[in-house]
């Protein structure tokens, strides 16, 4: 890792996720949040390629929006991310409704699955994209537990219908890899990618 840090850069988080905002705030990063509508449909079936693609789309959409508004983006880095859950060859995004959340939780029950997050950095004429994979092991969930979780946790804005930092933590017996990746923003991967792209540490 480089010895210097990005103290003179302006950061924009291209995400609506309160969890990603909270991670950056807890790290002491000063940033603003800007979002833009993006097409999240894709024929890509590999979760690693998919999250990199969607992360890049989000970042580019915000960049184009700000340039159209006449913003000066010099010394500005746009951070974007996307997360999915992969299990049994299926990619799980956010559940559409309670029935979809129920289906997802039953798929995850008693199994190991992968949480895959993409990270994209755009700024000063440079572009970097990467991904992180974390394995998560769920307990067996009976129907009563699934219904209680759906009623209590409101899982509709979460990939795979759960958040590790909430009620679902009671059902997770272990993880292998980056915890923050499961929350929604892989901090180590972000710092590594920033160093590779801009030649200095993010943190």
Residue ranges and their predicted role:
Residues 1-2, 65:
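A generic local structural motif
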Residues 3, 7-29:
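N-terminal beta1-alpha1 ligand-phosphate binding loop
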Residues 10-12, 25, 46-203:
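Anionic-ligand binding patches
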Residues 16, 36, 124:
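Cofactor-binding loop segments of dinucleotide-utilizing enzymes, especially the Rossmann-like FAD-
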Residues 30-32, 48:
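Active-site regions of enzymes building and remodeling cell-envelope glycoconjugates
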Residues 32-40:
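A short beta-strand-loop structural module common to alpha/beta enzyme folds
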Residues 43:
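Short Asp/Glu-rich motifs
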């Amino acid at each position: 890792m480089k010895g210097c840090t990005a103290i003179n850069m302006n950061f924009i988080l291209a995400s609506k996720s309160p969890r990603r905002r909270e991670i950056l705030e807890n790290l002491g990063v000063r940033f603003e949040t800007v979002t833009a509508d993006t097409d999240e449909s894709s024929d890509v079936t590999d979760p690693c390629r998919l999250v990199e693609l969607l992360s890049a789309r989000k970042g580019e959409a915000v960049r184009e929006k700000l340039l159209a508004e006449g913003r000066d983006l010099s010394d500005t880095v746009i951070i974007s991310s996307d997360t999915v859950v992969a299990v049994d060859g299926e990619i799980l995004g956010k559940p559409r409704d309670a029935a979809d959340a129920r289906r997802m939780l039953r798929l995850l029950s008693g199994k190991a699955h992968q949480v895959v997050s993409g990270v994209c950095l755009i700024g000063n004429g440079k572009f970097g994209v990467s991904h992180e994979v974390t394995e998560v092991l769920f307990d067996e969930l009976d129907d009563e537990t699934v219904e209680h979780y759906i009623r209590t946790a409101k899982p509709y804005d979460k990939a795979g219908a759960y958040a590790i930092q909430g009620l679902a933590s009671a059902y997770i017996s272990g993880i292998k890899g980056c915890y923050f990746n499961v929350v929604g923003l892989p901090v180590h991967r972000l710092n590594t990618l920033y160093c590779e792209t801009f030649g200095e540490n993010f943190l």
